[in-house]
A protein has these predicted regions:
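Amphipathic alpha-helical recognition patches that constitute DNA-binding helices
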Residues: 58, 103, 110
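Conserved GNAT acetyl-CoA-binding A-motif
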Residues: 84-97, 106
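Active-site acidic-Proline motif in GNAT/NAT acetyltransferases
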Residues: 61-66, 70, 98-100
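Residue-level signal for well-ordered, solvent-exposed loop/turn and beta-edge residues enriched
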Residues: 5, 37-38, 114, 129
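Conserved catalytic-core motifs of GNAT/GCN5-like acyltransferases
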Residues: 93-97, 109-131
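Short amphipathic alpha-helix that is part of the acyltransferase structural core
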Residues: 1-7
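Acetyl-CoA-dependent GNAT
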Residues: 7-66, 77-78, 83, 139-140
Length: 140
């Protein structure tokens, strides 16, 4: 969130607002080193909509910069697909994958996600310029 290059939120969470935010999710999972307790990444999973579209879920992922290249993201996304199915969702949809997030886009496509097109200038970067976003989906 602080980098302003991938998440739509602009405000950082403190301990109280963070606890409330994560408690609201259908699933919150972490990639943690069991020996040291160090958290390398996490994801949240929740409904993308309500009612007749409530079978579609959405997720967001974060991987610690120093842990990139260790396949943490792949493990998080794969687990998220399993959790989505286990919670009764039928589709996992990403609403806004930023164009410059090429590592994530390649990972999603390698794991079977389908791009739905492009939304020109759909994401305002921290420095104020706009980048395209790509919605993706995966049938669970």
């Amino acid at each position: 969130v602080e980098d302003g290059v991938a998440f739509p939120q602009e405000e950082l969470l403190d301990a109280s607002s963070g606890a409330a935010f994560f408690a609201e999710q259908t699933c919150t999972a972490v990639a943690v080193d069991r020996q040291t307790g160090h958290i390398y990444g996490l994801y949240i999973l929740h409904p993308n909509n309500v009612g007749r579209c409530g079978h579609i879920c959405n997720a967001s992922y974060a991987v610690e910069r120093e842990a990139r290249g260790l396949h943490i993201g792949e493990k998080l996304v794969s687990d998220c697909l399993r959790q989505g199915r286990a919670h009764g969702f039928r589709i996992l949809q990403f609403n806004a994958v930023v164009a410059s997030n090429t590592h994530a886009r390649h990972l999603y496509e390698r794991l079977g996600f389908q791009p739905l097109g492009v939304i020109p200038g759909g994401f305002r970067m921290k420095d104020g310029h706009y980048e395209d976003i790509y919605p993706y989906y995966h049938v669970l």
